[in-house]
Amino acid sequence: MSFFGLKRYSTPILKPMLPFFLGGAIVFYGTVKLRDAMMDSAEYRNDPRNPKAGKYGSDH
């Protein structure tokens, strides 16, 4: 069957790319956890640029 003149070939795409997708997901997860840990640190807890700054009380 031809779709706009293109033939269908059984070329594997997902299987060879799976390690790269998993690696990207692991790096993304680690980056998010590191960012959250840095925002919760004592040094940046009351920084006005911190999006979570309003969640902490003045006793921190």
From Swiss-Prot:
It comes from the Eukaryota. The chain crosses the membrane at residues 13-32. InterPro entries: ATP_synth_F0_jsu. It is found in: Mitochondrion membrane. Its main location: mitochondrion. Keywords: ATP synthesis, CF(0), Hydrogen ion transport, Ion transport, Membrane, Mitochondrion, Transmembrane, Transmembrane helix, Transport. GO terms for molecular function: proton transmembrane transporter activity. It is a single-pass membrane protein. One of its GO terms (biological process) is proton motive force-driven mitochondrial ATP synthesis. It holds the Pfam family ATP-synt_J. GO terms for cellular component: matrix side of mitochondrial inner membrane; mitochondrion; proton-transporting ATP synthase complex. Mitochondrial membrane ATP synthase (F(1)F(0) ATP synthase or Complex V) produces ATP from ADP in the presence of a proton gradient across the membrane which is generated by electron transport complexes of the respiratory chain. F-type ATPases consist of two structural domains, F(1) - containing the extramembraneous catalytic core and F(0) - containing the membrane proton channel, linked together by a central stalk and a peripheral stalk. During catalysis, ATP synthesis in the catalytic domain of F(1) is coupled via a rotary mechanism of the central stalk subunits to proton translocation. Belongs to the ATPase j subunit family. F-type ATPases have 2 components, CF(1) - the catalytic core - and CF(0) - the membrane proton channel. In yeast, the dimeric form of ATP synthase consists of 17 polypeptides: alpha, beta, gamma, delta, epsilon, 4 (B), 5 (OSCP), 6 (A), 8, 9 (C), d, E (Tim11), f, g, h, i/j and k. This is ATP synthase subunit J, mitochondrial. It comes from Schizosaccharomyces pombe (strain 972 / ATCC 24843) (Fission yeast).
